[in-house]
Amino acid sequence: MNVISSRVARRAWLALAVLVLSAPAWAAEGPSGEALQPTSHKAPPAKYVILFIGDGMGLAQRMAADLYMDAMESKLPQAGAFRLVMNRLPAQGLATTFGADAVITESAAAGTALATGRKAVKSVLGVDASKTKAMTNLSELAKANGRKVGVMSTASIDHATPAAFYAHVARRSDYYSIARQLAASKVDFFAGGGLKQPKGKDGRKSDVMKEIEAAGFTVCRTAEDLAKLGPQSGRVLAIHPSLDSEKSVVYEIDRKSEDPSLADLTRKALQCLEGPEGFFLMVEGGKIDWACHANDAATAVRETLALDRAVQEALKFYLRHKDETLIVVTADHETGGLSLGYSATGYKLHLERLAAQKMSLGVLAKKVSDYRKTRKYETARFEELLDLLKDATGLVPQTPEHKAAAAKALADLVEQEKALKNLTGKAREEAEDDFDDAKVEYAQMVAMVLAPAELEAMKRAFDASMKKLLPKPKTTTPDPAKYQPDLSYGGREPFAVEAIRILNHKAGINWGSYAHTGIPVPVSAIGVGEKTFTGLCDNTHVQQKIAAAMGLTTDGK
């Protein structure tokens, strides 16, 4: 893995930690090992601009993904040896995220700020605080200046962040109006999720897809169709072949290997948009936020890594157009109050334990729901979900069989260590590698055992999940003096939530909220105008700096 100098790395991340007002530009290395030097401010306006937005991706989310990669190789982090491309870009800063009416923002207001350079109130997209005046966004500015435009997201393409770059509505939930504005927009390339309400909320309105096709869009729904796209394809709406019930792209942890990744979509967008006109492309990792709302660390890490691989595709493009390109990576807000550290694990992180999780909390919850449909409350048995628990998270109860397997694994380790004394040279090196792997496997085997308190917590969560089979109380108005909302499971499937929570804690991860937080988020950049992105700024300034780097007006008319 290529590294940057420790002195420079300390400076860059100290700037983030203490919120200094300036930070030095430093050289990173690209995927091929080529040094990425700061771009001269004397360069002409950026011809190609790619803005990456990790929805809900705070500093903790980025470092969790970075440290996870180290942990998976049984390595301690090294000074300056950041694993994520976004963490190695030469300009690093922070942006505040508050909205016009709240310290803790939400995605519509934050997306509007990043798209228009103006503050907005909650739940509005592309309009001012009066909810009557449209505010010009970067996509519209870019088109007015002759550039091509692309908008991508792993959320539904009419969700808050992507919609902020082409729509103007007083309510972010007005999906039908947003979809119609997509059809009427001048955006050249859309990709990612589908449309939530193409026939309106009641399903009785005219199908917006017909308007989209009539507007000249080529609509793709398969990986094969996506592969055929190129500069000759004209305007494109590429809908991912695997969508969930919310019309968003399935989580990376649940994605089938044959389905396109966010990096694949980004590579295709760059191929379709590249040309003499230049372009502005916004790429959102929209479901980092969703995973963090669920306090699902393993899924959030994989979503962050998926976004970083998309950034790497943009970096390859940058290396071919160094003096004409600007890449910016930021977030609309942090979600979940993620903490790299938990009281029970003290000063230790065990992020490699997150690798035991094989499905998102949402998929696990669906499997629990499916089980519940086959039982009555009186016949549901905790033991019947233990195999699912193991398959999903690696967590197991302490059984005689597991105890015996752990004892055998420990005995094998002792024998392996003894055998090392009689080996030399290459044979010893190979045996030491095998011994190290065996130690990791043994540690994982022991760590994944449910402690008595954890087992009881899982049983309580199972009971809470199965109680949904019981008739609802007839009372319609709870006594306010007696009613207390149950925040234990965040409104999600209790069995799934508790399983993921226990795994998080075993990894040394904790969460402070099921909602957004007000902490500033990282801003990273490379290319034309990169130095302007260092230090502490506001999210509205991110838009203004991008517009300035592109040579666009920011008058908001």
Predicted segments, located by residue:
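Cleaved targeting-peptide boundary
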Residues: 28-33
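Generic N-terminal helix/loop capping motif
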Residues: 19, 26, 60, 92, ...
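Compositionally biased, intrinsically disordered low-complexity regions used as flexible
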Residues: 1-3, 505-506
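Bacterial N-terminal signal peptides
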Residues: 12-24
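Mobile, glycine-rich extracellular loop/lid and propeptide segments
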Residues: 36, 41, 46-64, 114-164, ...
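A post-motif C-terminal structural segment
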Residues: 43-48, 57-112, 159-557
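Bacterial N-terminal signal peptides that target proteins for export
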Residues: 2-14
